[in-house]
């Protein structure tokens, strides 16, 4: 795997994940209490023995840069390993921003070409899954493909949201359609049992969806980008073009948990699914294939007379006499007496506040970090460093689906209340 370079696409402005992307790039959005989205593809690469990685971003990349530089020093073992962020930049040849996935790679192809590698692994920075890329790349090599696309078997309902592939029995891609509907969708069905699915599973999931993960052979990638300078997107333009001109395209079927965390609803569900018993769909408890993140050296969490069920609590948290059910709490979370948290995601804090600091804040009419006394929070996301006052109710009482209240420090997306980073919600507020 030393002859593979990974390119992780950080995504655009992250409008579908707004307001979580208000102050950070999409790959830097916190996940599962202590990780960030970018930790998933990077950990998959490290576990697959791929140690050369570039992360392409163009929006709010400060916290992402900080996280990566503090977490991944892959050259310490005297190899050539690195994780480097490449932000969109203007040059005389390309005065514009990244205009799509393929355009982002094209703008930096001068840098990627300098590396003496055989394959380029193109990954997405906003997906939750565990995958051994070495199997994927070996499949690409053994089939003699020019381009291999990772494919996920899906049912008809899910299929409408993806680019779909129709393949022959050897997995060679014959046709590619972007988000087909109706009869156009039915024509894309394939017998997925020949890719290792059981007969029952194959019947339920007869479509192969593109996961947005690709392996390109070196010459194929640069030739496609060079010959088609107006093509901006891999899925919509570059792959159909490669198919049309007769390149050898193969699919690699991945039949395991995979979730695209592109929207607030999907992000919320994916986080809370981690609390499922007895086995969550995705687990961070895997010694063979761990997910890495920044070591923070925090003390253990302290729970005082609390009732907690089906929840995940990040380290360095202090929970007083509260009731927490089916929730995920991030590092350094503070929850005071008589608080009820249900079906919620608290991202925690970036720093501690001492007891004396909290007392002084209260005296001056301020609100300390965390969730104040007597507050009820249901079906909500509280971003980092949120200060929720006492006797606050955050339950979306009017069952609003979408709302923007930036002046009050919150938004509602998919019926979920999202309190923004560093927001202060005064005592007695009802949302």
From Swiss-Prot:
Gene3D superfamilies: Hexapeptide repeat proteins (2.160.10.10), Spore Coat Polysaccharide Biosynthesis Protein SpsA, Chain A (3.90.550.10). GO terms for cellular component: carboxysome. Disulfide bonds: none annotated. This is Glucose-1-phosphate adenylyltransferase. The lineage of its organism: Bacteria, Bacillati, Cyanobacteriota, Cyanophyceae, Synechococcales. The gene is glgC. GO terms for molecular function: ATP binding; glucose-1-phosphate adenylyltransferase activity; structural constituent of carboxysome shell. It catalyses: alpha-D-glucose 1-phosphate + ATP + H(+) = ADP-alpha-D-glucose + diphosphate. Its EC number is 2.7.7.27. Alpha-D-glucose 1-phosphate binds at residues 163, 178-179, 210. Pathway: Glycan biosynthesis; glycogen biosynthesis. Homotetramer. Pfam families: LbH_GLGC, NTP_transferase. It comes from Synechococcus sp. (strain WH7803). Belongs to the bacterial/plant glucose-1-phosphate adenylyltransferase family. Involved in the biosynthesis of ADP-glucose, a building block required for the elongation reactions to produce glycogen. Catalyzes the reaction between ATP and alpha-D-glucose 1-phosphate (G1P) to produce pyrophosphate and ADP-Glc. InterPro entries: ADP-Glc_PPase, ADP_Glu_pyroP_CS, GlgC_bac, NTP_transferase_dom, Nucleotide-diphossugar_trans, Trimer_LpxA-like_sf. It comes from the Bacteria.
């Amino acid at each position: 795997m030393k002859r593979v370079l990974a390119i992780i696409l950080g995504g655009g402005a992250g409008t579908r994940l707004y307001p979580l992307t208000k102050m950070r790039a999409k790959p830097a959005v916190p996940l599962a209490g202590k990780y960030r989205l970018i930790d998933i593809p990077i950990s998959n690469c490290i576990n697959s023995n791929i140690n050369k990685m570039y992360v392409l971003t163009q929006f709010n990349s400060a916290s992402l840069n900080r996280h990566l530089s503090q977490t991944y020093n892959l050259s310490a073992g005297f190899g050539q390993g690195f994780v480097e962020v490449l932000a969109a930049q203007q040059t005389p040849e390309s005065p514009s921003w990244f205009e799509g996935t393929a355009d982002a790679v094209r703008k930096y192809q001068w840098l990627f070409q300098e590396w003496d590698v055989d394959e380029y692994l193109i990954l997405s920075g906003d997906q939750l899954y565990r995958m051994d890329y070495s199997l994927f790349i070996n499949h690409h090599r053994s089939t003699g493909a020019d381009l291999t696309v990772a494919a996920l078997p899906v049912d008809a309902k899910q299929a409408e949201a993806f680019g779909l592939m129709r393949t022959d029995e050897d997995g060679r891609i014959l046709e590619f359609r972007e988000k087909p509907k109706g009869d156009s969708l039915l024509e894309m069905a394939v017998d997925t049992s020949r890719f290792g699915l059981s007969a029952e599973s194959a019947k339920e999931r007869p479509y192969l969806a593109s996961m947005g993960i690709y392996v390109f052979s070196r010459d194929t990638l640069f030739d496609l980008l060079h010959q088609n300078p107006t093509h901006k997107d891999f899925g919509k333009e570059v792959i159909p073009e490669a198919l049309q001109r007769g390149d050898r395209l193969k699919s690699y079927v991945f039949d395991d948990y995979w979730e695209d965390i592109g929207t607030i609803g999907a992000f919320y569900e994916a986080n809370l699914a981690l609390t499922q018993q007895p086995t969550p769909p995705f687990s961070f408890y895997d010694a063979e294939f761990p997910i890495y993140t920044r070591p923070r050296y925090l003390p253990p969490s302290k729970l005082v007379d609390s009732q907690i069920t089906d929840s995940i609590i990040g380290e360095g948290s202090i929970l007083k006499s509260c009731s927490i059910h089916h929730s995920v709490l991030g590092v350094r979370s503070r929850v005071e007496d008589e608080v009820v948290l249900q079906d919620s995601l608290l991202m925690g804090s970036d720093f501690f506040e001492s007891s004396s600091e909290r007392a002084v804040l209260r005296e001056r009419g301020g609100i300390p970090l965390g969730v104040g006394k007597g507050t009820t929070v249901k079906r909500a996301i509280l971003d980092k460093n949120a200060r929720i006052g006492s006797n606050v109710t955050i339950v979306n009482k009017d069952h609003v689906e979408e709302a923007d209240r930036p002046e009050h420090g919150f938004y509602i997306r998919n019926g979920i209340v999202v309190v923004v980073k560093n927001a202060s919600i005064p005592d007695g507020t009802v949302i």
